[in-house]
């Protein structure tokens, strides 16, 4: 029987004020179904798209929105305690605002405070979601690169229909794909080295990893060639992120 890597794992889920936050309850439900213990942190903007009550009911844990909420003050440094007692933190969706705060250690929300307090051995996964023009803006890309350099695994957005009515990059990935990336990250972080056959050329940044499960996420899809190309690129970016995480182990 295949081992469920998420069983009894403590996952911190950060939810920010992207319109994609309305999908966050589905993400919580999927993690709970796989046996994870989920603690949700929300920015105040995120509460405009889904409610702490919904997230608390699904996660079966109190949701933290306010840094100084009296019920959250279970210890002198509750955010440190929370950060040091989890198996991974996932910020999904992540806005350009929170991405910028992560890049510059602006800890004015519980979500960012906990993310910055994570020990380096605990994986931080960030799934940005925003409109295309915001995603490709140089400021967003600078923040993205800084967060990446600091050790976070970036789950890149996909191309598709956006809430603005435009079509382009910035769309929140499918829930099952985000969960798969989290599972693979936990699996790899629990090993002293990766067992997959990976080759990397510094000259041309080519990644060749035929054995990676990420390459098979979309194997059974029947879709237009444009979407297939976009998803192949998405998988390649994820493999690259995982390879860089390996080099830091």
Predicted segment positions?
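A cross-family phosphate/adenosyl-ligand binding-site feature
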Residues: 1-126, 132-249
